[in-house]
């Protein structure tokens, strides 16, 4: 029986409607941080069938939060990954406007304190944005809008990615894969030796993030520290969240983190003491803690050449690695896929 041209078109439309595998390309995205969720958004909008894998118990990548446990701040979330974000490119400004409309994010400050050998001064810069309850909440919002459109596996550790004409992620076949996790982690799961070699060229610096709550008022918003071998940045969490809670986060220098990363208790003590010295306070802490980020800041890197069915996204390939760079790189994922 001859179907006829019109009937064939109807059948193709039905196949597309039901997203049969050989009509709709199936793409795996590994990593549900900023760039991974941005890439998943772009791929879904372009009509691809997306499966998103993330190994963490919670999504977010380097958008880490901790919940305080000691009164009077019990239940209060603090950022222990990225502290804030800025927006310079129009595409990202549109996304930020959406977060602002949803009351997920708000403007914080455009001026930080700077301390160096000459004392304390103020430095103006771009507007810093923060998120109510922590930056990770931005990605919770994004994944809530994506969940019904993708297959999503949280707390799932991918063990192997085989890349040939097709891609296999833990033996499951896809047409392409997006590596949206730090290159050292990607290199541990990719089986192809040439791709492993390319990924091994991308390096990251570590950072330790400590924090404390106290009864002492903190008379600053954010502070760049240029005269300490241990501390790089201080953030007043009470200022960020507009609740004036006396909570400070302390971001280490790369060099300090590399030297102290294997003894977190000692590192925390050193960072707390240094912060007290910088702020000229003598605080007894209600609560304190420390977080280790082995893969915190990417060193300057060229994006490695990948097969046409592999994309690698993230802020590692930006001159200014940050949340904006990660989001935009993920949103441009189709430029890497054939």
Residue map of PLM features:
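Short beta-strand to alpha-helix junction loop
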Residues: 84-88, 120-141, 262-267
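N-terminal FAD cofactor-binding segment of flavoenzymes
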Residues: 69-110
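N-terminal Rossmann-like FAD-binding beta1-loop-alpha1 element of flavoenzymes
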Residues: 27-52
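Active-site substrate-recognition segment that forms the wall
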Residues: 211, 216-217, 222-261
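Central helical "cap/lid" subdomain
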Residues: 60, 73-75, 174-221
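A conserved short coil-to-beta-strand element within the FAD-binding core of flavoproteins
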Residues: 153-166
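Conserved flavin/dinucleotide-binding core of flavoenzymes
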Residues: 58, 66, 73, 80, ...
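Glycine-rich FAD pyrophosphate-binding loop
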Residues: 44-69
């Amino acid at each position: 029986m001859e179907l006829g041209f019109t009937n064939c078109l109807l059948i193709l439309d039905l196949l597309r409607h039901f997203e049969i595998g050989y009509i709709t390309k199936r793409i795996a995205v590994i990593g549900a941080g900023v760039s991974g969720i941005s890439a998943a958004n772009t791929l879904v909008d372009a009509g691809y069938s997306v499966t998103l894998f993330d190994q963490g118990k919670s999504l977010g990548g380097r958008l880490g939060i901790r919940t305080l446990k000691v009164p009077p701040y019990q239940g209060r979330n603090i950022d222990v990954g990225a502290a804030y974000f800025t927006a310079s490119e129009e595409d990202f400004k549109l996304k930020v406007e959406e977060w602002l409309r949803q009351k997920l994010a708000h403007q914080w400050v455009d001026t930080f304190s700077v301390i160096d050998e000459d004392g304390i001064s103020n430095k103006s810069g771009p507007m810093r944005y923060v998120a109510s309850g922590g930056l990770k909440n931005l990605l919770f919002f994004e994944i809530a809008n994506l969940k019904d459109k993708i297959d999503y596996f949280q707390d799932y550790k991918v063990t192997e990615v085989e890349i040939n004409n097709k891609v296999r992620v833990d033996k499951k076949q896809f047409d392409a894969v997006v590596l949206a996790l730090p290159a050292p982690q990607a290199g541990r799961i990719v089986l192809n030796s040439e791709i492993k070699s390319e990924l091994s060229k991308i390096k990251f610096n570590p950072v330790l993030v400590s924090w404390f709550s106290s009864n002492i008022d903190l008379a600053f918003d954010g502070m760049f520290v240029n005269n300490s071998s241990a501390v790089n940045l201080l953030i007043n969490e009470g200022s960020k969240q507009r609740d004036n809670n006396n909570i400070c986060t302390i971001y280490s220098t790369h060099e300090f983190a590399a030297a102290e990363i294997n003894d977190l208790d000692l590192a925390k003590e050193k960072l707390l003491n240094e912060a007290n010295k910088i702020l000229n306070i003598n605080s007894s802490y209600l609560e304190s803690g420390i977080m280790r980020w082995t893969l915190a800041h990417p060193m300057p890197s060229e994006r490695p050449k990948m097969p046409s069915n592999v994309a690698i996204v993230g802020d590692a390939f930006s001159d200014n690695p940050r949340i904006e760079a990660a989001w935009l790189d993920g949103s441009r994922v189709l430029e890497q896929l054939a």
